[in-house]
Amino acid sequence: MKMSIRIPPRLLELAGRSLLRDQALAVSTLEELPTELFPPLFMEAFSRRRCEALKLMVQAWPFRRLPLRPLIKMPCLEAFQAVLDGLDALLTQGVRPRRWKLQVLDLQDVCENFWMVWSEAMAHGCFLNAKRNKKPVQDCPRMRGRQPLTVFVELWLKNRTLDEYLTCLLLWVKQRRDLLHLCCKKLKILGMPFRNIRSILKMVNLDCIQEVEVNCKWILPILTQFTPYLGHLRNLQKLVLSHMDVSRYVSPEQKKEIVTQFTTQFLKLRCLQKLYMNSVSFLEGHLDQLLSCLKTSLKVLTITNCVLLESDLKHLSQCPSISQLKTLDLSGIRLTNYSLVPLQILLEKVAATLEYLDLDDCGIIDSQVNAILPALSRCFELNTFSFCGNPICMATLENLLSHTIILKNLCLELYPAPQESYGADGTLCWSRFAQIRAELMKKVRHLRHPKRILFCTDNCPDHGDRSFYDLEADQYCC
């Protein structure tokens, strides 16, 4: 019979747990508590909802940072409120505890090993290693040396109302705005009435926001309500706009005025590096207005599933802010009836820096491909190239592959199955497709040794609308 051996708790751990049961616990008592006991005891107090102990432990917290987000994933609003109550005492009293060091309450949803490190240290007695493994505190430069407490938070506005934790926090912040600084670096708006969004934005220091994602089915009149706030995001580095539509009740004159008001805000975004626009219908015929207001060199530009005019592509190729792009994604923009000379010029401009290129589902046909091949073959930094969903024949595909042969950094290539792979009714002929892949594999291996090439087929009955296959005849990649 096997016997399990249970390691007895360390004396320090037992002493700490007895403190949590002490109804007369005081800050003065905690000031004598070894630093290494604070994190594991705080976790236990939080999980057991020892509210009075939490209030006092916050007041005697011996670290600059309290990363609370991993703990509030447990349903314990009462414990969260106790932490805020403890902070209240710190913010309002004139004399603070001797060992109090707390400067940052961190509620960001990031990978956090603070609690794990200290828990393992408690179990093994390796407190020296725990101290070495602590992450440096992330400050907010704007408020350094001013308010005694900075609260870091990520705002995900995805429902009609806020979750109970965020509601509790924002109410607490609203009542103490002069005593602390609310810093939000990431803002996601995924669905909420704008009147609620407005009240939240008024509480946040907009200078702190570095990333914004708006993924709502907004029409232009709603966009006008967000526009004034955009201009105040002076440290914004990443902007994602998705599903912006033009209301049928908006006249062309009104549309032009609204787009002008919106795009001129980009003149103030002097830190912007990444711009993502998906299904943004008002760009059609107005892309030049936005591009002319960019004041920084973008690293990432994705304009996907939008309708653009040929003149929009021309303006894009002439924009000085795109010359240092590392990522260019134009997937879902129909280019079938357009000249690809602007795209050729664009690729020539970014050839020295471009690492990722996505031209999926652009409707590019055989007669258009030659226009971009010379420029594409000079993108020596390119590591990913996707060309799926474009109806090209075997000869064009072979020509395309021969031009990417000199791109030594290319790690992943995705191409459409040639049109010869399909029958007259548009369904995939598996035997023919297998033969084509075998022929391509032989030719490609003769030219070079690619790291990975995948071929995409449409309308696959077994694996959904789109399936990917390696060069090997029997290898399927979902």
UniProtKB/Swiss-Prot annotation:
Domain of life: Eukaryota
InterPro entries hit by this protein: LRR_dom_sf (IPR032675), PRAME (IPR026271), PRAME_domain (IPR050694)
LRR repeats: 99-126, 181-205, 206-232, 233-268, 269-294, 295-326, 327-347, 351-378, 379-403
Swiss-Prot/TrEMBL keywords: Leucine-rich repeat, Repeat
GO biological process, one term: negative regulation of apoptotic process
GO cellular component, one term: cytoplasm
An annotated Gene Ontology molecular function: ubiquitin-like ligase-substrate adaptor activity
Family membership noted in the UniProt record: Belongs to the PRAME family.
Protein name: PRAME family member 11
Organism: Homo sapiens (Human)
